[in-house]
Amino acid sequence: TEYRMYEDVAVVLKEYGYHQYEISNYAKAGCECRHNEGYWQRKDYLGLGLGAASLLGKERFSNTSDMQEYLKNSSAPEKIQKNWELLTREDEMAEFMFLGLRMTQGVSKKEFQEYFGTAIENIYGEVLKKYKKQGLLLEESGRIFLSREGIHVSNAVMADFLL
């Protein structure tokens, strides 16, 4: 089965010195993909070029995918930016959770509290309780993360964090 193959590959990768640092990636220590980590941690990024996406603070947008439009307006960034949205607090909370849970280190309760001004349990208490009880989420050293079993059903778990 796919589950067994996934677990077998994980064993082989570990034997060769790789560690799982996100639910779909392995790397040797110090060689983790910084781009992915920045994305999962919701750090600002600026996409340059045709169709490139950006997240700057609470603003998310992408550049046009139309080459003619892009070339015609490339000196005026506001004319090539499409799909602009201002993220709400709820959007940011949901992204904090479902993007952060993609990393094996999970999410920091302290960082959630500092950024949003409220405890993670005040927003997601029932969801956290449900998945901890099922053994799909674990908590250790102030971090909440997917268990090994939770990784296999991560999409279902993460969907419950959408507000």
PLM segments and residue spans:
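C-terminal scaffold of the Radical SAM
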Residues: T1-T118
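Short amphipathic alpha-helical interaction segments
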Residues: G117-K132
